């Protein structure tokens, strides 16, 4: 059977389920596909199919992730669900599954648990901008006051981590009952909570700005000179667009950015009017010598990104089984940090009270690089030793 093609007429949003183990994330994911399938907006994905998620590799790290897609009247969604807690940590830190918003699943019978807190903290750290809550297993709670209490606890917890706890939509229901019923009717006692949840996701999580509409940035992968014409920097445009005559800055590996003008844009030896996010292009740069630009720098819209040496990050350290270190590291650890296209040595400062970091841990650290790199919040990087990946991280703040 030919695969159905999703029409790209609707805005696209990436979301995922987060929350404590056994609170019903995977059941909810299955229930969403079953209810939306009744109106032809999804293909049914059974629980065990989602739970046995395939392994993927991102930045040398193995992560189990299930991907489902579905649509509502308004949008097309790509939804990620992870079987294990460690998979969430890795997923959120590596950005393997970038989330524009998340559905936090909390069991009404248990209330917020340790991983509920940890996932909210991670979402705050790695920049998941919006959260909608599904209060699950409501069929197991007879006392409406208890439901109100859990509702309050969840809102307080979200506010603790600087999410707007009072405004966040909380939908109460039972994913298991909705999955077992799967009639998909909006008036159904169980299926209606799934519709309410999808309405909340549609309304509350805004459509993200497309990469093409953001300020131009292209990591420099290679540089060569064309006799009589000048220097060409090649790379894949990460965001925004570039055309002939645009002023750009060369940022990184130097203390100050350098301005230049793009005098030509080519793709596969053909001249382009404009290069956009996702294109592999060569940019001809005015008055720049072959020696004045190198791999590891970026071309960017002037003023949009600056070179920095000091920043804070949330990192995940690979286990021995994942090919990482066999031993812990301590304050003053000096690995290489791989940003976009290049390795830069840096020194690690551990948080107060943390003596050492073990393989398999995730921790917040401060890093001081020996040379400045174009850095901003949300930028992902790998931690390497001698070309081997030993960790992954995301920039959570700049310290100057």
From Swiss-Prot:
Annotated residues for binding of GTP: 19-26, 81-85, 136-139
Region of interest: G4: 136-139
Entry binding sites for Mg(2+): 26
Keyword Metal-binding among UniProt keywords: yes
Span list, region G5: 174-176
Keyword Magnesium recorded: yes
Taxonomic placement: Bacteria, Bacillati, Bacillota, Clostridia, Eubacteriales
Keywords assigned by UniProt, alphabetized: Cytoplasm, Elongation factor, GTP-binding, Hydrolase, Magnesium, Metal-binding, Nucleotide-binding, Protein biosynthesis
InterPro entries reported in the protein's UniProt record: EF-Tu_GTP-bd (IPR041709), EF-Tu_GTPase (IPR050055), EFTu-like_2 (IPR004161), EFTU_2 (IPR033720), G_TR_CS (IPR031157), P-loop_NTPase (IPR027417), Small_GTP-bd (IPR005225), T_Tr_GTP-bd_dom (IPR000795)
Self-association and partners: Monomer.
Covalent S-S links between cysteines: none
Enzyme type, top EC level: hydrolase
Function, in words: GTP hydrolase that promotes the GTP-dependent binding of aminoacyl-tRNA to the A-site of ribosomes during protein biosynthesis.
Name of the protein this chain belongs to: Elongation factor Tu 2
Subcellular location: Cytoplasm
tr-type G domain residues: 10-209
EC number(s) per entry: 3.6.5.3
An example molecular function term from Gene Ontology annotations: GTPase activity
Family under the similarity heading: Belongs to the TRAFAC class translation factor GTPase superfamily. Classic translation factor GTPase family. EF-Tu/EF-1A subfamily.
Family matches, as HAMAP family: EF_Tu_B
Catalytic activity from the UniProt record: GTP + H2O = GDP + phosphate + H(+)
Region (G1): 19-26
Region annotation G2: where it falls in the sequence: 60-64
Natural source organism: Pelotomaculum thermopropionicum (strain DSM 13744 / JCM 10971 / SI)
Region (G3): 81-84
GO cellular component: cytosol
């Amino acid at each position: 059977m030919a695969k159905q093609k999703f029409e790209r007429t609707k805005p696209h949003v990436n979301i995922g389920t987060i929350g404590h183990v056994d609170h019903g994330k995977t059941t909810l994911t299955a229930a969403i596909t079953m209810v939306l399938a009744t109106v032809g907006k999804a293909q049914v994905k059974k629980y065990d199919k989602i739970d046995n998620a395939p392994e993927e590799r991102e930045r040398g790290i193995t992560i189990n992730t299930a991907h489902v897609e579905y649509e509502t009247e308004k949008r097309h969604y790509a939804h990620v669900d992870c079987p294990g807690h460690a998979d969430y940590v890795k997923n959120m830190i590596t950005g393997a599954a970038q989330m524009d918003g998340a559905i936090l699943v909390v069991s009404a019978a248990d209330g917020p648990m340790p991983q509920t807190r940890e996932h909210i903290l991670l979402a705050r750290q790695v920049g998941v901008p919006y959260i909608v809550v599904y209060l699950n297993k409501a069929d197991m709670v007879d006392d409406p006051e208890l439901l109100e209490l859990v509702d309050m606890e969840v809102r307080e917890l979200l506010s603790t981590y600087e999410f707007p706890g009072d405004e966040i939509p909380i939908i109460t229901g039972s994913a298991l009952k909705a999955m077992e019923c799967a009639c998909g009717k909006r008036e159904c006692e169980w299926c209606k909570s799934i519709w309410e949840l999808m309405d909340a996701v549609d309304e509350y999580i805004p459509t993200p700005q497309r990469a093409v509409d953001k300020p131009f940035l292209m990591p420099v992968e290679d540089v060569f000179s064309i006799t009589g014409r000048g220097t060409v920097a090649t790379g894949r445009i990460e965001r925004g667009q570039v055309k002939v005559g645009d002023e750009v800055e060369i940022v990184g590996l130097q203390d100050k950015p350098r301005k230049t003008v793009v005098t030509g844009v080519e793709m596969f030896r053909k001249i382009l009017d404009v290069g956009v996010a996702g294109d592999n292009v060569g940019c001809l740069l005015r008055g720049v010598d072959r020696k004045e630009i190198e791999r590891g720098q970026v071309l960017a819209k002037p003023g949009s990104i600056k070179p920095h040496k000091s920043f804070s990050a949330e990192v995940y350290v690979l286990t021995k089984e994942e090919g990482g270190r066999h031993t812990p590291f301590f304050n003053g650890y000096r690995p290489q940090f791989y940003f976009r296209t290049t390795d830069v040595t840096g020194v690690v400062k551990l948080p107060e009270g943390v003596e050492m970091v073990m393989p398999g841990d995730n921790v917040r650290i401060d890093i001081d690089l020996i040379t400045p790199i174009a850095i901003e919040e949300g930028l992902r990087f790998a931690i390497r030793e001698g070309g081997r990946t030993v960790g992954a991280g995301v920039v959570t703040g700049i310290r100057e």
